[in-house]
Amino acid sequence: MICADALYAGYDGKVILENVSFSVGEGEIVGLIGPNGAGKSTLLKTLRGILPMLSGAAMLMGDDIKVLAAKDFARRAAYLQQRVEMTFDYTARDIVLAGRYPYLSWWRQEKADDLAIAEACMEYTGVLELADKPLHTMSGGQRQRVLLAKVLAQQTPVLFLDEPATGLDLIYQEEIFRFCRALCAAGKTVLLVAHELSLAARFCSRLLLIGRGMLLADGAPQEVLTDELLTHAYGAPVRVAENPITHHMEVYTEAEKGDAEKAQLLSVILGTPDEGRTA
């Protein structure tokens, strides 16, 4: 369904990702993980055709993404972007109905079936009661669920989700991952960016670890989420252990490193005099 071959990606003349190769099959939920700035969102935008490839190749459902027309692309893959700034008074219903645009001719407005699909998606993500509320007046979590409903309304076989759990509370974070797993069980393919490593370990069939502009690891969660790989990628001590209650993998950091230096900086910020320092 998704294939990248020796892909180089970036923007503004800067190379962010180098020589990235992987494939995602039908029905898989694959998580892109790694530190901030590693290139996860850049990779997703490149695969979606938002950013141009610097070199290499990328395929979507067997076709080169460079030759796909906009509507054809939109019928194959929906994209949930990381941040959406909205100042106009578009309501949740307006936003979700926009997910139906790949199926509309320029002269055709939404019909009853489009509205029914949009409302079903809003009900599924728990925002139907917000249908007439402007998006810019909503909380971050409400807005994220509206945007997820829009992606669903697009009814595509492939979903690119950039941090779909951002801004959500613990219950909805897990619900998003459960929902993605249900989609994949129905045959859809999901490639998502995740910072919630413990949830990614539970719900993703595979993980791609991005770090230092490269694909550092590709495999099952237990193969990728190791102390050594995560410490290398994040540049700080990371530990992976089994939760004795849930028996799921949990990821921890060792915060002690650098605490002494941070304490000195905090004393400056708070105006706390150091020992031996005279006024």
Region annotations inferred by a language model:
Residues 56-64, 73:
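Conserved ABC transporter NBD signature motif
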Residues 48:
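Helix-to-loop junction immediately C-terminal to a conserved catalytic motif
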Residues 233-279:
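ABC ATPase nucleotide-binding domains
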Residues 97, 112-130, 155:
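Conserved ABC ATPase "signature" region
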Residues 159-162:
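Catalytic Walker B motif of ABC-type/P-loop ATPase nucleotide-binding domains
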Residues 134-138:
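Conserved ABC ATPase signature
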Residues 33-35:
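The feature captures the beta-strand-to-loop junction immediately N-terminal to the Walker
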